[in-house]
Curated annotation (Swiss-Prot):
The gene is IMP4. Its main location: nucleus. This is U3 small nucleolar ribonucleoprotein protein IMP4. Pfam families: Brix. It comes from Homo sapiens. Gene3D superfamilies: Probable brix-domain ribosomal biogenesis protein. InterPro entries: Brix, IMP4/RPF1. Component of the 60-80S U3 small nucleolar ribonucleoprotein (U3 snoRNP). Required for the early cleavages during pre-18S ribosomal RNA processing. Part of the small subunit (SSU) processome, first precursor of the small eukaryotic ribosomal subunit. During the assembly of the SSU processome in the nucleolus, many ribosome biogenesis factors, an RNA chaperone and ribosomal proteins associate with the nascent pre-rRNA and work in concert to generate RNA folding, modifications, rearrangements and cleavage as well as targeted degradation of pre-ribosomal RNA by the RNA exosome. SMART domains: Brix (SM00879).
Length: 291
């Protein structure tokens, strides 16, 4: 079993590396094509291979845009089978972190919560794979305040690391009532860049396909690389007006890393993207949108 998993993982990484090399070559050809069409100087870094790239441009067409990629491999059952989400915490969780994990369990339809105990990460991931879990969520805290969320897609990855801030739990709001557990409609806003679409896929594939008559809405809205999570239910007051009610919880997510492997492969998995906060332009740049 372990040999089979290692072989499948190597095959997946090989496909991913080949796709990355092909994407890089395609980007260079696109830059050369734009320079030729606009009658501009060829970029310096492309001049040595300009003739070879121009020769291969003649055989390119728009037909390869929709071919399958490693993303199809990761989420090949998305929309066909409902995701199976497992939620756990860091070791020795406080009472508030346990409450937050319980609320997250209600956010994702069909999710299960597992007490961490003294289990190691590798044992958790192996147990999740053996039971057909598609996504493992781990919540971290600092002095009782949730500060981190890890979303690991199984069995091959990716694993996204988020910082949590401005967390408002349902337990903090009196007389809120019960939460609907219907399959929600999803709204994703502001994920226009290539990385933004990647993050949007990681988040939206945590939810099953909703029914048309569902009155539950979950929003992931990106602004300046901070992803706002909001949870609402709506009801029609008449044939023209709709009443929107926030039911919580609410929080902000800040992406700081995406790894290609699963959670237990931190030491060996390649980093797909990492936020570098200490560069001079870190405050000015946005990565999840092109606006």
């Amino acid at each position: 079993m372990l040999r089979r998993e290692a072989r499948l993982r190597r095959e997946y990484l090989y496909r991913k590396a080949r796709e990355e090399a092909q994407r890089s070559a395609q980007e260079r050809k696109e830059r050369l094509r734009r320079a030729l069409e606009e009658n501009r100087l060829i970029p310096t870094e492309l001049r040595r291979e300009a003739l070879a790239l121009q020769g291969s441009l003649e055989f390119d067409d728009a037909g390869g845009e929709g071919v399958t990629s490693h993303v199809d491999d990761e989420y090949r059952w998305a929309g066909v089978e409902d995701p199976k989400v497992m939620i756990t915490t860091s070791r020795d969780p406080s009472s508030r972190l346990k409450m937050f994990a319980k609320e997250l369990k209600l956010v994702f339809p069909g999710a299960q919560r597992m007490n961490r105990g003294r289990h190691e990460v590798g044992a958790l991931v192996r147990a999740c794979k053996a039971n057909g879990v598609t996504d493992l969520l781990v919540v971290h805290e600092h002095r009782g305040t949730p500060v981190g969320l890890i979303v690991s897609h199984l069995p091959f990855g990716p694993t996204a690391y988020f910082t949590l801030c401005n967390v408002v739990m349902r337990h903090d709001i009196p007389d809120l009532g019960t939460m609907s557990e219907a399959k929600p409609h999803l709204i994703t806003h502001g994920f226009s860049s290539r990385l933004g679409k990647r993050v949007s896929d990681i988040l939206r594939y945590l939810f099953p396909v909703p029914k048309d008559d569902s009155h539950r809405v979950i929003t992931f809205a990106n602004q300046d690389d901070y992803i706002s999570f909001r949870h609402h239910v709506y009801k029609k007051t008449d044939h023209r007006n709709v009443e929107l009610t926030e039911v919580g919880p609410r929080f902000e997510l800040k992406l700081y890393m995406i790894r290609l492997g699963t959670l237990e492969q931190e030491a060996t998995a390649d980093v797909e993207w990492r936020w570098h906060p200490y560069t001079n332009t870190a405050r000015k740049r946005v990565f999840l949108s092109t606006e």
